[in-house]
Amino acid sequence: MPSMKLKSLAAGVAASLASLAVLLPAYAQPAASNIEKLKQMKVSGTDPNIPTVPQTGKNADQLRENLKRVKLPPGFRIDLYAVVPDARSIAVAPSTNMLFVGTRKTNVWAVTNRNSGDTATEVKEFAPSLKFRNPNAVCWTRDGFLIVVESNRVYTFPAAEFFYEGADVAVGEVVPQGQLIPPEEESFNHSGRVCRIGPDNKLYITLGQPFNVQPRDKLALYTKVGIGGIVRMNQDGTGREVYATGVRNSVGMDFNPKDKTLWFTDNQTDGMGDDIPMGEINRATQAGQFFGYPYIVAKTRVTEFGYDKDPLPANTVNPQVMTDAHAADLGMAFYTGKQFPAKYQSGFFSTQHGSWNRTKPVGARLLYTSLKADGTADKTEVFAEGWLDNDTGTYRGRPVDVAVAKDGSLLVSDDYAGAIYRITYTAP
């Protein structure tokens, strides 16, 4: 990058943080936190030498060996792109070949491809001077800010793809700790968020509710706050509103680039049987829509707490796609590249993490859903499978998220195997 542009970016970072200091509410951090130092552009004292994740050796070799079992349509191939421990949500950087990858632990990973080749050249922690808590969600604003969403906080990092090398980075808080949801509602369960910037340039965040079936005494609070739904807000954290409700636990969403509607996956209730309720992929066409939970999930009435005895809300929106029960539909992305054949140019890919609450395991695969001319779902088919050994029920990988790279290849994260895969197409 030309030095003039770097100077311009550095100036922009300083200006952006100055604006954030005015816009964002003050929040008292624990004494042990480094965030206040970083917000003031001060050093934290963290060792700047960040260890890298080995990309060769027995682990990488075994990951490549496992990929030989994955079946794809003719003309496609899958390769190991990077070894990334606990890899979850993927955010493709807007101006470089970098990826930023969230986890459900304490790390956000910076994945660098310095030579623009077929594999990553370096993987290391991003912003290790911060102590992340379940930073599952990562996404980019159109002007180059990296958004990281924890269970109960939202960070913003100006020009993260250019200023990621050291332990200390420029940072702001969109939503301070404890203000995304009420602190007393924090849970270890269903607390991995996902985020997207919408066509309206607002920040959208999923908020899974923590129960298998939420108790009745939580209904009013959750509806008001957006737990068990999707919220949206301005990029500075103001103007928050509940966008969608009746969602049990969505861990994947994307906007259709053609009609701007929001699509999202939803994981449904356990303990009702091997084959019910089915998983959901939904389409939100406007704010304020209700998607059924906890009264009905994938057209199956929920019996716990007597929800099946209640009248079904008249405004309930039915799912666009119903998938195998308990397969755990997670990440999704509309295909916006040009590398794949025309068949894949007007729909989306989604992942299934794989079941646990089922006698015969199912999932651990990628799906492709095509759309009709009116923008609704047409057909859903298996695109990639083989991480689950159907004979033994053993998982060799569990896909989480999917993203489209700049060259049109498809990137897939796997938190079980600790990897990012790359799917490419060459004419058969």
Regions found by a protein language model. Give the residues of each.
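Conserved beta-propeller blade signature
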Residues: M98-G102, F145-V148, K202-T206, T261-T265, ...
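Beta-propeller domain segments
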Residues: P30-P73, G192, Q209-D217, V225-G228, ...
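Residue-level detector of Asp-centered blade-edge/turn motifs that repeat once per structural unit
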Residues: P94-T96, W140-D143, I197-D200, N256-D259, ...
